[in-house]
Curated annotation (Swiss-Prot):
Gene3D superfamilies: Ribonuclease Inhibitor. LRR repeats lie at residues 32-53, 125-149, 150-172, 174-197, 198-221, 223-244, 246-267, 268-291, 292-315, 316-339, 341-362. The lineage of its organism: Eukaryota, Viridiplantae, Streptophyta, Embryophyta, Tracheophyta. The gene is LRX5. InterPro entries: Leu-rich_rpt, LRR_dom_sf, LRR_extensin-like_regulator, LRR_N_plant-typ. It is found in: Secreted, Cell wall. It comes from Arabidopsis thaliana. This is Leucine-rich repeat extensin-like protein 5. Modulates cell morphogenesis by regulating cell wall formation and assembly, and/or growth polarization. The keyword Cell wall biogenesis/degradation applies. GO terms for molecular function: structural constituent of cell wall. Its main location: secreted.
Length: 857
């Protein structure tokens, strides 16, 4: 009985306590409601908390910006710009270099990194036409208010720590011509909002964390350059790839697999293509023989099978060909080695059984780890016998042709090209990519119309990733494109150190010399009357992608995205950026040579990966093509990669002659290690025996990369961004593409983000810290001593990466560029191991100037 009584009493006590607590809470809440006891600090704290989680209808973050009534603005557009920039300033969590310190007051045109110019539709009023915060090491996110910058033509924020997604209200930026978000920490699926930008020509999303499939509309859009390498994109490429009018496309270091679309042969304007470091597992389509303008062709480090199509002999502009680390077999067609401009042919780590003698006379070639009789460093007889015992490969079984669905009334899939995108190639309905196995020979002829004359096709001289034999045998991807220096990137601005540009002050970087003939973009672009928006000429900062530590060093470099001819951005007052040189669009595809179907090779057995060429870097760097900035007017930074030019003469400069100070780059050989930064547009010289002589580091202007001759001596790298240092020489960027800029768009002398000052290059950790984290500590300087090249005729170790000087938009002081001594081709002797202090390795072979500096991880 006592126990029962105690239990009842206990239950009663709990009930009474609950009732007491309930009524106490209600009374306290009522007292707060009626008496308003919250202090101002408490109210402010609650407001900030609410704003932190505020989202618009798209889920984008916004900020609460109050405009002081006492502020006076020249016009409503500058008032909107004030709201947008103040919201962005609130969204910045860390600004270690004080780029946004002077973002105060109504004079937004004096803000650091902000450039104004006359509006296209009303020349009597000023508006914000360009933003350049490259290499600022800023952490934060992009608020939705940036959609208020409706007159913006250039938006460059590479090499920062921005995270999150791209705001949906970016679709209001109807005049945006160049978008460079590279080397940040953006994540999520492909930012489809960029497909709604009608004037967009240059898209650079490299070195982020984007994932998922790539939308078909991307290849139906009228772009000139696509750089999506070093992300996490997956799945197969859409079969309408050939509809794209781009001159440069880099999808390296992702997770693509499946077929190489046969429509690839329809890309009539294509000059550089880098598909390395993926998982493509089909045959090379014979239709690639139609690509008459391609200078750099890199499909290394995939799982491609079959034989090399004899139609490759029709790619008459080819300079760099890299198919290493695949499962190719059969005999190499003699027509390939007889290409008139071929400087480097790398086909190591395959299962080829025949090699024509003419290939041995190429300036640079690598045939190691094959099954070639009477050649050194081949696979073991057991490996070759095991591979030859496999059944032959039937290339038709992959079903890599375009979807052959009959023109039923089936509505085209929602993958219709986004506004402004180039129409899909004719005769092919934009039906979802069906994997109907059509013979690869069925590429639809209707390649997407070439992008307007503004297409800054990188000079054909860009070296292919293949490295010349002179350098060590390691097939590191660092081969830099040997593009002749004649392609000074238009408006390439000298790379200025990442120091925050003082408002209105031009960065200390040497003045960017306008690329020869640099003219404002031709009016072919949709923008209304050109506004002279002074955007800093974006010289190709080392676009080199940070080396992926785990990936084997591919012999071919990844081309850094050449910044398309900067849209005519209004010239910022006082800025002496070199005029952007519109490179003439490349001629349409020459009549496609009849593609010969690749011989069915034996079924590819997993390639036996021989030891990667002696690449010194512990982590195999993925070759990245870094667009060298225009050499004009800037002291060339020493090329980070010792890309010794092959014996053949340097490719003739495209329509542009390189700045007088730069001699034409001789064909360069790939050095085993990819240098992190792209070499400046300077003539590249074969590495001289003495390693002590480093080439001078050129200053990069972010926008269009000018051809960079390779200096053998190791340059110092300025930024630390890439994860694992790559040892690989990036080829010189091709001559500056001749861009016809959008007609009315303002001529921006846009200095695209120059590479950061010589920061110490430490491989960035794979995982990015939370976007909120403050500026990361500077990476430790790492001195890599690449081993000397093993045998001549192989990769020569790249020279130390060049020191990049980032040039902020204002005209940098004139820098005296002393050209390095004429290239001495020492095939056997590699340049001294470069000291890798810079950021991500450049993507060799790309003549584009928009350089995403390596991210600071």
């Amino acid at each position: 009985m006592k126990t029962k009584m105690m239990m009842k009493n206990t239950s009663l006590i709990f009930v009474l306590l609950f009732i007491t607590f309930f009524f106490t809470s209600i009374s306290y809440s009522l007292s707060l409601t009626f008496n308003g006891d919250l202090s101002d600090n408490e109210v402010r704290l609650i407001t900030q908390r609410q704003l932190l989680y505020f989202r618009d209808e798209f889920g984008d973050r916004g900020e609460n910006v109050d405009v002081d009534p006492s502020l006076v603005f020249e016009n409503p557009r500058l008032r909107n710009a004030y709201i947008a920039l103040q919201a962005w300033k609130q969204a910045i969590l860390s600004d270690p270099n004080n780029f946004t310190t002077n973002w105060i007051g109504s004079d937004v045109c004096s803000y650091t990194g902000v450039y104004c110019a006359p509006a296209l539709d009303n020349r009597r009023i000023r508006t914000v036409a360009g933003i350049d915060l490259n290499h600022a090491d800023i952490a934060g996110y992009l608020p939705q208010e940036l959609g208020l910058l409706t007159d913006l033509a250039l938006f460059h924020i590479n090499s920062n720590r921005f995270c999150g997604t791209v705001p949906h209200r970016f679709n209001r930026l109807k005049l945006l011509f160049e978008l460079d978000l590279s080397n940040n920490r953006f994540a999520g699926i492909f930012p489809t909002v960029v497909l709604q930008l009608p004037s967009l020509k240059f898209l650079d999303l490299r070195f982020n964390e984007f994932e998922g499939p790539v939308p078909r509309e991307l290849f139906s859009k009228d772009l000139d350059a696509i750089f999506i390498n070093h992300n996490r994109f997956r799945f197969e490429l859409p079969d309408n790839l050939g509809d794209s009018p781009v001159s440069v496309i880099v999808v390296a270091n992702n997770h693509f697999h499946g077929c190489i679309p046969t429509s690839l042969g329809d890309m009539r304007n294509l000059e550089e293509i880098i598909f390395m470091e993926n998982g493509f597992n089909s045959c090379l389509p014979s239709q690639i023989g139609r690509l008459k303008n391609v200078t750099v062709f890199d499909f290394s480090f995939n799982e491609l099978v079959g034989s090399l199509p004899a139609s490759i002999g029709g790619m008459v502009s080819m300079e760099q060909l890299n198919v290493a680390h695949n499962r190719f077999s059969g005999k190499i067609p003699a027509t390939i080695c007889q290409l008139p401009r071929l400087e480097n042919f790398t086909f190591s780590y395959n299962f080829f059984t025949g090699e024509p003698p003419v290939c041995l006379g190429l300036p640079g070639f690598d045939d190691r780890r094959n099954c070639l009789p009477a050649r050194p460093a081949q696979r073991s007889p057991g490996q070759c016998a095991a591979f030859s015992s496999l059944p032959p490969v039937d290339c038709g079984s992959f079903g890599c042709g375009r979807s052959t669905r009959p023109p039923v009334v089936v509505p085209s899939p929602p993958t219709t090209p986004s506004p402004g995108g180039s129409p899909p190639s004719p005769s092919i309905s934009p039906s979802p990519p069906i994997t109907v196995p059509s013979p690869p020979t069925t590429p639809s002829p209707g390649g997407s119309p070439p992008s307007p004359s503004i297409v800054p096709s990188p000079p054909s001289t860009t070296p292919s990733p293949g490295s010349p034999p002179t350098s060590p045998t390691t097939p590191t991807p660092g081969g830099s494109p040997p593009s002749s220096p004649t392609t000074p990137t238009p408006g390439g601005s000298p790379p200025s150190s990442p120091t925050t540009p003082t408002p209105g002050g031009s960065p200390p970087s040497s003045p960017t010399t306008p690329s020869p003939g640099g003219s404002p973009p031709s009016p072919s672009i949709s923008p209304s009357p050109p506004i002279t928006v002074p955007s800093p000429p974006s010289t190709p900062t080392s676009p080199g992608s940070p080396p992926s530590p785990s990936s084997p060093t591919p012999s071919s470099p990844i081309p850094s995205p050449p910044t398309p001819s900067t849209p005519p951005t209004p010239i910022s007052p006082g800025q002496n950026s070199p005029p952007i040189i519109p490179s003439p669009p490349f001629t349409g595809p020459s009549p496609p040579s009849s593609p010969s179907p690749p011989l069915p090779p034996v079924i590819p057995s997993p390639p036996i990966v021989g030891p990667t060429p002696s690449s010194p870097p512990p982590s195999t760097p993925t070759p990245v093509y870094s667009p060298p900035p225009p050499s004009t007017g800037y002291p060339p930074p020493p090329p980070f990669t010792g890309y010794s030019p092959p014996s053949p003469p340097p490719p003739p400069p495209p329509t542009f002659s390189p700045s007088p100070s730069i001699p034409p780059p001789p064909p360069q050989t790939y050095s085993p290690f990819p240098p992190p930064p792209p070499p400046p547009p300077q003539t590249y010289y074969p590495p001289q025996p003495s390693p002590s002589q480093p080439p001078q580091s050129p200053i990069y202007g972010t926008p269009p990369p000018s051809p960079i001759p390779y200096l053998p001596s190791p340059p110092q790298f300025a930024s630390p961004p890439p994860p694992a240092p790559y040892y690989y020489s990036s080829p010189q960027p091709p001559p500056p593409p001749h861009y016809s800029l959008p007609p009315p768009t303002p001529t921006y002398h846009y200095i695209s983000p120059p590479p950061p000052p010589t920061p110490i290059h430490s491989p960035p950790p794979q995982s990015h810290p939370p976007c909120i984290e403050y500026s990361p500590p500077p990476p430790p300087t790492v001195h890599y001593n690449p081993p000397p090249p093993p045998s001549p005729a192989h990769y020569s170790p790249p020279p130390s990466p060049p020191v990049y000087y980032y040039n902020s938009p204002p005209p940098p002081p004139a820098v005296h560029y002393s050209p390095p001594p004429p290239p001495v081709i020492h095939h056997s002797q590699p340049p001294p191991p470069p000291i890798y202090e810079g950021p991500l390795p450049p993507i060799p072979g790309i003549s584009y100037a928009s350089p995403p500096p390596p991210p600071f991880y």
